[in-house]
Amino acid sequence: MFSTEPRSDTAPGSPSCSETKRRKVRRGTHSCWECKRRKVKCSYSNPSDPRCIGCRRRGTKCLSQQDVDEGASVVSAAVDEDRRIGDRMVRVEALIEQLANQVVNRESEKVVGTNDSESDLATSCSPQDTQTLKHLLPQKVNSPSTCIEYAPVSAALHAALPPHEDINLIIKAGLDVSLHRLMTTSLATLSRCIDGFRAGLAEIPSVDTHPTLLARYLLILATCLQAAHPELHAKEIRCLSEPPRLAMRRLVNAATDLVTSKDELLSSVEGLECVMLESLYLANDGNLRRAWLVCRRAMAVAQLLGLHRVDSQQLPCLTFLSQSVDPRFLWFRIVCTDRQLCLMLGLPQGTPDVSMATESALANDSASGRFERKQCVIASRILERNEASGDFTNDDLATVLKLDEELQQAANEMPSSWWLVPNLASSLHDQNKTIWEMLRLIEQMLYFNLLNLLHLPCMLRARQPA
């Protein structure tokens, strides 16, 4: 127990002890100055110990409250020390916050640097387009922690890149064009942009880029290689380190195994774009069933993200895109691709949604875009007709005639010059013109395919069983 006699590190009877001023304390007071200041229990392991357990553990001087001068100085020094510690903690917190902001800024700069092609689209568009699309700017969902988490995946994807010499040869051959922008950008917007279909192969992503962006680059590169002509690009093909077909398969396999098959990497604009690029590659490669499976997966992910809703919100994005991404347009592209594949494979459609052909949607699109949207709705009704069971009736004939009338009416809205057969040979040296002519040819092909699929089942179906 603490007695009323003073306790200190100085032995009793010494000169320094006798010179210490005393003060009267309340009867029963046993705490030293430090324990009183900290409001903790003051106890001794042995009554003869010069210091209490708390002061011995803290390494502080143990003074009785009877020692006025020294006790006051100790308390004052302790208060000053606490204040200094508090100031240091504030400075440390400020430094940590500053360092964290610097790391985030560096990561953002790296990601933006790997996606200059998206910025090119916005800078090449007119100011009116940029102002109209500002409110649809996607959110960014990238952080240093995610980059660190997926560092091994990014390293594996980066290792799958072909040599820089091969990429330069592909660009030199004029193959730096891709249809991937059609997934996120309307024809009306692309028609007002310079080099809107440029693939951006020159902006090679670094090893610490997010894996979804690396996979996107690999898939775009694979679709560009699909356009390589064995005769027109024979010189460049011979100089490549590996044949284009082997390179395409290797690039797509890497992107599929490491990204598009991982659900956690698909909840963004770029993630959905990767899945649709894989479906596009498979369809162009003749693997329609696999392309349908991949497209249906993209539709399921889009529905989980709420893209099928009329009031769908902005999608999260991995980069600071200057171009905007309309979630409703991305949903329209997924649905349109699904219906075209279902028509060719005889499969039911994934959704009966026809909101892509509302008056507001048609008014904000170009002539080709309106034609494409109307065809998408007619394709949905053809698929519904094909799924209906039972024998062919007069009502079915009336439905076919009505759909034929709507299809012809949509076709008549296009100018007569649009229906001329595109001359791709005359535009070989103009990449932008070539891609637009090819798009016109594809739309014509889809129209006549719809016309055939509308009437052939009626012509081939027997009225009575054989």
UniProtKB/Swiss-Prot annotation:
Role this protein plays: Transcription factor; part of the gene cluster that mediates the biosynthesis of eupenifeldin, a bistropolone meroterpenoid that acts as an antitumor agent.
Description of the deletion phenotype: Abolishes the production of eupenifeldin.
Chain spans, region Disordered: 1-22
UniProt protein name: Transcription factor eupR
Stored InterPro entries: Transcription_factor_dom_fun (IPR007219), Zn2-C6_fun-type_DNA-bd_sf (IPR036864), Zn2Cys6_DnaBD (IPR001138)
Keywords, comma-separated and alphabetical: DNA-binding, Metal-binding, Nucleus, Transcription, Transcription regulation, Zinc
Applied value in biotechnology: Eupenifeldin is a bistropolone-humulene meroterpenoid first discovered as an antitumor and anti-leukemia agent. This metabolite also shows anthelmintic activity against the parasitic worm Hemonchus contortus, anti-malarial activity as well as antifungal activity.
Gene Ontology annotations of biological process type: DNA-templated transcription
GO cellular component entries: nucleus
Encoding gene per record: eupR
Residue spans of biased composition, Polar residues class: 1-18
GO molecular function, one term: DNA-binding transcription factor activity, RNA polymerase II-specific
Record bears the keyword Nucleus: yes
Compartmental location: Nucleus
Residue ranges of the annotated DNA-binding region, renumbered to this chain: 32-62
